[in-house]
């Protein structure tokens, strides 16, 4: 079986893990309703994308 030849130093271990951090999710504001949404995605609240209604939402009575 493979066995490490020498102990990995803290510096080398941390440099290897430098790119493993979590990336924060970028949010944008919907121009139609003002809700938070992902960029380049249809708004989950109102169904609009680039000023056009893509998904028809049922009107609550």
Swiss-Prot record:
GO MF assignments: structural constituent of ribosome
GO CC terms of this entry: large ribosomal subunit
A GO biological process held by the record: translation
Keyword Ribosomal protein recorded: yes
Keywords associated with the record: Ribonucleoprotein, Ribosomal protein
HAMAP family, alphabetized: Ribosomal_bL32 (MF_00340)
Protein name: Large ribosomal subunit protein bL32
Name of encoding gene: rpmF
């Amino acid at each position: 079986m493979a066995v490490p030849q020498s102990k990995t130093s803290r510096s080398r271990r941390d440099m290897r893990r430098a790119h493993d951090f979590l990336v924060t999710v970028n949010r944008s504001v919907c121009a139609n309703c003002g809700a938070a949404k992902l960029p380049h995605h249809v708004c989950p609240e109102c169904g609009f994308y680039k000023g056009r209604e893509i998904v028809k939402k049922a009107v609550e009575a």
